[in-house]
A protein has these predicted regions:
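Active-site/acyl-donor-binding loops of N-acyltransferases
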Residues: 1-16, 75-76, 136-165, 238, ...
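A conserved beta-strand-loop-helix scaffold within acyl/acetyltransferase catalytic domains
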Residues: 3, 11-81, 129-269
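Short, high-confidence coil segments that cap the C-terminus of an alpha-helix
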Residues: 55-57, 121-124, 231, 288-290
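Conserved acyl-donor/pantetheine-binding loop and adjacent beta-alpha core of acyl/acetyltransferases
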Residues: 73-105
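A short, internal acetyl-CoA/4′-phosphopantetheine-binding micro-motif in the GNAT/acyltransferase core
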Residues: 98-110, 260-271
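Non-catalytic accessory segments adjacent to catalytic cores
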Residues: 100-150
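Alpha-helical elements of Rossmann-like donor-binding domains used by nucleotide-donor carbohydrate transfer enzymes
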Residues: 113, 202-205, 280
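Aromatic (often tryptophan-rich) hydrophobic motifs at membrane interfaces
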Residues: 216-329
Length: 350
């Protein structure tokens, strides 16, 4: 643990940094605005990620006048041009949530204050999954992977109501996936508060399969995360073996699609299985009276064919080396995620 203060032009910046999430959360609870940090910034989630994410994670709080920020930094050696489909490996400190969710890795009332402080941190930095960006000089800026969000309409009482609301070509695609997955059984597994798994299916190899095929690799979580992460697991079983799974988390009126995994050799066309899995996520959300599904990032085209809309996310990049920082500012096209998806017009009119 380390405590320190630094000066800026107006006020002293109070800084509290530590290595353990429970220590940071105990500190934050003394501040009224942080007494009830919501998912995913819960003690259980942060402690589990500390154990299961191999990257070094540190926790930071800064305050100056009315401005404050809590943020997480994880350190890794990464290809900073992954989104631009090039390669340049660099040691990077990422202000981000330490698993592949669409959430940012900070809570603040003043993003400009947070960014100004991050510019002082030595080395290369990325601030990921910013949803409401501000203009800030001296940093690279661009789009990262958007989050896919599906709104669940009030008239959807059953999954059949949802499917009936789709235009014919999208209904046909879903029905085809159902037909081709008719020998796939679906099991629902609840992970209790105690983190006790109550099924015998080993889904971790499926997660590793999908991780290895991912174009945008970040962290690779340990098995323990999937055994103890609180939520609901849907397991898709074919020939008495798990063919796929999804890990879901309920947060108020929102359902969060956290992770998935597949056996890519179990079917001749795994796209059918993926459609089938997404359909069951929609059905689960309707059953649980959710208003929104956060389908997360990646696989945008498939999720858009279910009616999901894209919620933009942005990044900032900075390096204390002036030459490298100039590249971060001017090399936007090499760093950012570029996309041009069609408007599928998934739903029927009226």
């Amino acid at each position: 643990m380390k405590k320190k203060s630094a000066k800026n032009e107006k006020d002293r910046i109070k800084v509290f940094s530590c290595e353990q999430p429970d220590e940071m959360l105990a500190f934050l609870k003394k501040r009224p605005v942080f007494r009830e940090l919501k998912y995913p910034y819960t003690e259980r989630m942060l402690k589990l990620l500390k154990e299961t994410n191999p990257f070094r994670q540190t926790y930071h709080y800064i305050e100056s006048g009315e401005s404050f920020a809590f943020f997480i930094i994880y350190e890794s050696r990464m290809n900073i041009m992954t989104l631009g489909n090039s390669e340049w490996m660099m040691n990077v400190k990422t202000v981000g949530f330490p698993c592949s969710l669409s959430n940012s890795g900070y809570v603040t009332n003043d993003l400009e204050f947070l960014l100004s402080y991050c510019k002082r941190i030595k080395g290369g930095k990325l601030i990921l999954n910013v949803d409401e960006p501000v203009e800030m000089k001296g940093l690279g800026f661009g789009e990262t992977l958007p989050s896919c969000v599906l709104s669940i309409k009030d008239e959807y009482r059953t999954i059949d109501d949802y499917v009936a609301s789709l235009r014919s070509q999208y209904r046909r695609r879903i029905r085809l996936a159902e037909k081709r997955c008719r020998d796939v059984s679906v099991y629902r597994v609840e992970i209790s508060d105690a983190g006790m798994k109550n099924d015998s299916w080993d889904i971790y190899p499926l997660y590793l399969n999908t991780y290895r095929k991912s174009e945008y690799k970040l962290e690779c979580l340990d098995r323990k995360f999937f055994e103890e992460s609180e939520g609901t697991r849907l397991v898709f079983v074919k020939d008495d073996k798990p063919a796929g799974f999804v890990l879901l988390h309920e947060e108020g009126e929102k359902l969060v699609f956290q992770f998935c995994g597949m056996d890519y050799e179990c079917m001749s066309n795994t796209a059918d299985l993926y459609f089938f899995m997404l359909l069951h996520i929609v059905g689960f959300a309707i059953e649980k009276n959710k208003k929104i599904i956060d389908f997360g990032q990646t696989s945008e085209l498939t999720k858009m064919k279910f009616g999901a809309e894209l919620s933009k996310r942005y990044f900032y990049a900075h390096h204390t080396n002036p030459f490298l920082n100039m590249f971060a500012i001017l090399g936007k096209k090499l760093l950012e995620y570029r996309y041009d998806f069609p408007d599928f017009k998934v739903f029927r009119r009226g």
